[in-house]
Amino acid sequence: MKFKLKTTSGTARRGEMTFSRPQGEFTVQTPAFMPVGTYGTVKGMTPEEVRATGAEILLGNTFHLWLRPGQEVMRKHGDLHDFMQWHRPILTDSGGFQVFSLGKLRKITEEGVKFQNPINGERIFLSPEKSMEIQYDLGSDIVMIFDECTPYPATFDYAKKSMEMSLRWAQRSRDRFDELGNKNALFGIVQGGTFEELRKVSAEGLVDIGFDGYAVGGLAVGEPKEEMHRILEFTTPLLPADKPRYLMGVGKPEDLVEGVRRGIDMFDCVMPTRNARNGHLFVTDGIVKIRNAKYRDDTSALDPHCDCYTCRHYTKSYLYHLDKCGEILGARLNTIHNLRYYQRLMEEIRQAIEEDRFDDFVVEFYTRMGKEVPPLQKP
């Protein structure tokens, strides 16, 4: 992977990542949003439909794909690209967050994490080395190191020990990645909870090891929005300007805008797809909750500013009807729209940075939402 920083507008960055794959070179424009394909599919969507929304890179889930279908099945197909028939770039998370989410079902040691398989109950073990091996078999274009996602709230002492172990795991991830001869990209993950001192140690330690990109992890795990913004604003300047920066698991449209304001290049989140299945649809001036009875006979398009398949062909009344009847098509049309909304938002952001009017875009974005612009700590 090659990353090129093309221009900036304040602290907002406009760049591109280039990946060499057997099918040729693929470019991902940044800032980028990655739809989540947990089990090797963006729920309810074909790869062609996902691509039609504007997506250039997807996220796959190492933990879930390891448990099912497993490495052997993946190897028989070639890799995850062949398995799911998406031949563009894929980033896979390391499994660290999913293990963190298991709570009492897991036990963390220096060697790795022992936990109960949520599918069949057997005890299994995941280590930095094993995570690198799974992601190698997945053929991930961007591999994430194995880390512990520090919970919120956490004491300084817990966050410090967790961050220090994640740094040791980062080195072990780097070593095993290199031993495997993996020629793809490996990203480090900054941890340290809500403590700036720990974030600094983590970032500097990761830069010393050396990675192709750097993620900010351990955010959007329950902390107040102001805390997330504070830590993000503190952390991103510590990361190399010539490497992509990734905010993991975030988030709402406002979170993407705030991340870009603070120098982030990459995002992923289940929100557009999960919310679509629950009738919660993102539009230019806010949210449409399509299950609301007022849409029963509303013959207008979902969003007159949107060019997606759903908005070009169907009314709010039809989407309301499909949802009420529990029709699968409703979830699919909602998903197409939400994913296109996110990609249109990123397109608008990229254009605003190119034209050096990102601050104006931020004001416009919040104005059409009827919201105030959140302050930066360092305007």
From Swiss-Prot:
InterPro entries: ArchSynthase1/Queuine_TRR, TGT, TGT-like_sf, tRNA_ribo_trans-like
A single MF term (Gene Ontology): tRNA-guanosine(34) queuine transglycosylase activity
Assigned GO CC terms: cytosol
Keyword annotations from UniProtKB, A to Z: Glycosyltransferase, Metal-binding, Queuosine biosynthesis, Transferase, tRNA processing, Zinc
Region (RNA binding): 249-255, 273-277
GO biological process: queuosine biosynthetic process; tRNA wobble guanine modification; tRNA-guanine transglycosylation
Binding residue positions for Zn(2+): 306, 308, 311, 337
Obligatory cofactor(s): Zn(2+)
Pathway annotation: tRNA modification; tRNA-queuosine biosynthesis
Gene3D superfamilies for the chain: Queuine tRNA-ribosyltransferase-like (3.20.20.105)
Chemical reaction(s) catalysed: 7-aminomethyl-7-carbaguanine + guanosine(34) in tRNA = 7-aminomethyl-7-carbaguanosine(34) in tRNA + guanine
Record Pfam families: TGT
EC number: 2.4.2.29
Cofactor binding comment, as recorded: Binds 1 zinc ion per subunit.
Family listed: Belongs to the queuine tRNA-ribosyltransferase family.
Annotated protein name in UniProt: Queuine tRNA-ribosyltransferase
Native organism: Actinobacillus succinogenes (strain ATCC 55618 / DSM 22257 / CCUG 43843 / 130Z)
Gene of this entry: tgt
